[in-house]
Amino acid sequence: LLNEIAWTRVLIMVVGGSTYAFTLILLVFLLGIGLGSIIVARRSAPRAETAATAALAQGMTGVGAALLFVFFGLLPSYIIAVFQVPAWNAASRLVLMGVAVGAVVLIPAIGMGMTFPLLTDLTARSRTARGADVGSAYALNTIGSILGAVLTGFVLVVALGTQTTLRVGLVVNGLAALALAWLAARGVAEGSTEDRRLRVRVLSAAGLGTLALVAAAAAPGWSTRLIDLGPTIYARQPMDRVARQRFLEHRGVRQLAFREGANATVSVWEGESGRSLRVNGKVDGSDRGDMDTQVMLGLAPAVARAGATSALVIGYGTGVTAHVLATVPSVQRLKVVELEPAVVQMDSFFVGVNGSVLARPGVRVVIDDARSAFQLDRERYDVIVSEPSNPWVAGVATLYTPEFFRIARARLSDDGVFCQWIQLYQLPLPIVAGIVRSLHEVFPYVHVWFGGSADLVVLASPRPITYDRMWLTQLLGPGGQLKTLTREWLSIDNADQYFGRMLLGDSGVARLISRATLEHSDNQPRLEFVAARRFLDPGADAYVVFDSLIQLGRGDAGTSPFALLRILATRRSDAGVLPYLDAAHRAQPTVFEWSVRTAGIRLALGDTAQADSLLATVTGRSSGASPDALQMRGLLAAARNRPLAGMALREALAAGADTGQLRAALALLAARGASWAEAASQARGSLSVARGTFRHPYPGEFLSQALSQIALDAPAGLADSLLGYAVGRRPGSARYRELAAVAALRAGRCEDAAASFVELLDFAVQRDNGPALVRECWTTQDSTVRIGGGSRGAAARRVQEKH
């Protein structure tokens, strides 16, 4: 089982971790074993011939297993091609993925299927006790399978990794082939009839065995960047050749950590959009894009259960949800249940958003399956949060059944609140309704809240869910310990804004449940298969489902579509919000906020003309314009390089708008005018105050353009100092590192420029002319001619031309 387990761990990283993917790998493996057994069935041959055939089978197994090292680099490209044809459905894609799995699994599986009956025949003591011999062989095979599974899954993969484990398998197959070939040749007289009959088989087996050993030692491996692509998840959008290459290289992001645990492969990546946690190639949390959902999963149940003293979280992820619950002033005891230890080991990469929650007193981590942990636990909790991965991931759907919810309810205090995360992507409304119905079967009171752009936070309780505004103010109001988190990531300043995130109350949930078509239970786990098919053949748009939920919630007490829309528009680059903003503008044409928010998204998308026309009517009323409107006016003026842009930006600053964004635009204006000291001062100020949150995002194109001009044309020392500071503030930005290399070249700091070029390789950004430019820098340093901005400046510009 060593090969089978290692193959599975590698292949699910490419074909996805759904039940169908696991079934596909197992199907091909069993097919190969069956074919191998058929090939050698009902044969009776002398022992030497049996040994020679077994040697050939083991050699074929080893060489066939080595094909994974040859073909693996091609598999992601193949999977991308499979998902680039929209007309293909789930069944077609499964068949095509089966071809890929068969290419690397079928041949060695056939060899394994041949080996067992041959070795059973070979170890038989006589022809008269076949039953006992076969029984003994099966017993040994079963013991070996158990030991192989335990040793591989819990020791070899964890300690050595799958690549080395596969190489160990090649060594075993190669040595077995050579040993059996020697056994077949032993005692056979050279030149005899038997020798002539066995020679080709024995020599072939010895050659294949030797080739397997050579492959174990010398076969090129694959990079952890390549194995961590997740092509079935993230390569669905149309791609041209350049985009495909960028995807395959993970260009622009770097891998900070990679660990193969007993249950999953876990990694941490960093790029312009922050850090993300990947489990089996799928992002399961981040320090930016998922922050609203992660915060809301902790906040919503804490608000609904005022004064909660104990909480339990299923799934650690980045630790943000646990951090929110641990920060609630009344919580004294927090338990985190996490299946994969490697996830917890990645905690240190997210201390910026999880507040080192695991180091707090009263916080405890249990490494176990959620069901097992609940059944072994005798404590009760005021709040339980279940945030597993997507239901299409194999095994996860068991955490969405009524049976599991009953287990959770048994661990909940009488007035406790259970919180369930539901992902809207790739799940149509009837399936979402089915999950909520399963919850409602166990908990009579259910409310649905908005988590993120494609996430629901569902609250359930055995008693009516009530909300204490005084408790909410204590958490989020002035001096509240969650004020900063909720303000920056949820754009909540007061209680009314919090309740704007409510989607469905009691009556809305009743209407949603009436739409349910999915029956999912432990005995009939349909969700696992339905969700996996939807994953392979996506047809449900998250915003379509979200729109249906808004319609179902109309009229519920406490729900407000316009308040919810303000929250949706917090993500300023989300084009999916535009139809809702257009509808709001038609419904409330005198509310200029909708035009301002639309303009902000249009500007983020690069559509300055449309944004400009939207703002024309708003900013014409300068005396009554909001800080956001003034900010949009200033940013648009800067984007279009208008004469009074600087004045507009400073007016917005005085009104209290986003300092980071405005100072970035001022830096660009100063750089355009070659006012380098002013440009550097504004850029440094922008970097120093930027928070990278949804409310105060990192300055984007304005700051990048300003830094680019400063790196190329500002005084070398000034540019070098500023770009070094920029990299320190944004270590995940490959663009800033490239500009830092430019500035270092101009400043004559050749070694630092070389170091920056090397660091760029971690981001899959390679400058072919980098070594030559560094050598030129060193040559210039050694010369007696002072170049200043001459040769070094030209070298720096050649870096940009390559870009």
What are these regions (language model features)?
Residues 1-474, 529-531:
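Alpha-helical transmembrane segments of multi-pass membrane proteins
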Residues 574, 608, 642-643, 676, ...:
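TPR-repeat structural position
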Residues 562-563, 593-597, 627-632, 661-668, ...:
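Alpha-solenoid helical repeat scaffolds
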Residues 568, 602, 637, 670, ...:
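Residue at a conserved register position within TPR or TPR-like alpha-solenoid repeats
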Residues 469-566:
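SAM/dcSAM-binding transferase cores
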Residues 589, 623-624, 657, 691-694, ...:
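Short coil turns that delineate tetratricopeptide repeat
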Residues 571, 605, 639-640, 673, ...:
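Structural motif corresponding to the intra-repeat A-B loop/turn of tetratricopeptide repeats
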